[in-house]
Amino acid sequence: MIVIAQPNATEEQIQRIVTRVREFGLEAQISRGASRVIIGVIGPEALLREKAIAAMRGVEAIVPVLKPYKLAARDSRGASSVAIGDVRLGEHEDVVLICGPCSVESKEQILSIATIVKESGARILRGGAFKPRTSPYSFQGLREEGLRFLAEARAKTGLPVVTEVMDPRDLPMIEKYADCLQVGTRNMHNFSLLKEVGRSRLPVLLKRGFSATIYDLIMSAEYILNEGNPNVVLCERGIRTFDNAARYTLDLSAVPILKSKTHLPVIADPTHALGLREFVPQMSLAAVAAGADALMIEVHDSPEQAKSDGNQALTPEIFAELIPRLRAVAAAIGREM
């Protein structure tokens, strides 16, 4: 990073800045101009010391040279892809549909829905065995029984399974059944959980927190990458704004912005953003047009009887009608589905 000294900074103040930088174990290089002095700070922990240096007398501004997210940054490496089972997600791959119910409710239910979504074109099965609910009295999921049902659905259909992990203590159990770990919106800032999934052998689908900035999301991904897991997928799932016409606002600008800043696959979840079945198809089409590498769409064969979020799940008929429209949009931007 670069430290810009104030125009009236004294030589004593400049030397104190240099001394402090070197006390942090960093290298300081002074460059003297006609009216300003700048100090180049070099070292792996330079950005971590930014606030301490900025508070010193004689400092006008700090200019970071490198991004604080080193592992997630796109830089010159281009886009990467992530394998979930035998399905690859990424900028240079086909657009993928990740579909299924909000919650696994029974063996019969998940087997039926898995078959339906596969026949319509889905390539990955989603389903919650552990459910983070606003109310403690709401359905919390079937836990390991639900995981077993998901594994049976995978065996029947061949669809790899994505399911949410909420507690690091449940991770070993979930790893026995799942093909991908989902970190939900409420846990995007759960750094203990991020570190644990970062040590997992499974890929991680990281959802943006509903009050998180794009920078926050990337830094949460950095936690996972820093623990050694390179297989991270970013998911835009809606943010909380002043408007309450829908549950959240699906921030589709995040898709191209994230792609410009990171090499990680970026997907969208219009179901949870809207919370209303009637608007999910339109926003699904818009997400593909924005460049999303995959869509997460909830589908339920009896949404009126669903134990969670039935009003946002597409019926099999609506889902089947949406597929050719999604493929047409993908083709229009030079991609396949």
Regions found by a protein language model. Name each.
Residues 95-101, 123-127, 161-163, 179-183, ...:
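Hydrophobic faces of well-ordered beta-strands that scaffold small-molecule active sites
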